[in-house]
Regions:
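Mg2+-dependent prenyl diphosphate-binding active-site environment of isoprenoid biosynthetic enzymes
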Residues: 1-176
């Protein structure tokens, strides 16, 4: 269930209204998976979580070195935005909205902040509420983003409902 759940949520969310072409669903799903993969590569680095293995395989920085791991993560992040910009099926307004949703989920209000708080909390006694906040930022924001990306061209009164749904799925994902 953990693999490609974000991509599946984009398709499921988009299929509620059928405004997005399949090619754009693939573009958006790919962009989210690129961001997710970049975050895992960076998360494993010695300066972060210092993990030598990811899903039973040697981490990127163990196989290729720290410098190349950082560059690989950076390249994946840039590619995520590039493929959205290159999608000719999306309007310019939708492209901007998609890039804003994605950058908010992975930037200073999302994964980056969550990673920062996680690093700062190491070797400290933190509350369950603080742990949940960190996880909601590190993982939940990108899941919420996936649901919202599926609704990219469906600006409606249901936006709050889909955002709440995405947030709740993100919280549930932490339990699994």
């Amino acid at each position: 269930i953990r693999d490609r759940i974000r991509a599946a949520l984009i398709f499921a969310s988009a299929d509620t209204h059928n405004f997005l072409k399949n090619e754009s669903k693939v573009t958006l799903a790919t962009s989210v998976e690129l961001i997710h993969t970049y975050s895992l590569i960076h998360d494993d680095l010695p300066a972060m979580d210092n993990d030598d293995f990811r899903r039973g395989k040697k981490s990127n920085h163990i196989v290729f070195g720290e410098a190349d791991a950082i560059l690989a993560g950076d390249a994946l992040q840039a590619l995520a935005y590039e493929i959205i910009a290159d999608d000719n099926n999306l309007s310019d307004e939708s492209k901007i909205r998609a890039i804003k949703l994605l950058s908010n989920a992975c930037g200073k209000n999302g994964m980056v902040l969550g990673q920062h708080l996680d690093i700062k909390s190491e070797s400290k006694d933190i509350s369950q509420m603080e742990i949940e906040h960190i996880h909601s930022l590190k993982t939940g924001k990108l899941i919420e983003c996936a649901v919202m990306l599926g609704q990219l061209e469906n600006i409606s009164s249901n936006e709050k409902i889909f955002k709440s749904f995405g947030r709740n799925i993100g919280l549930a994902f932490q339990i699994i």
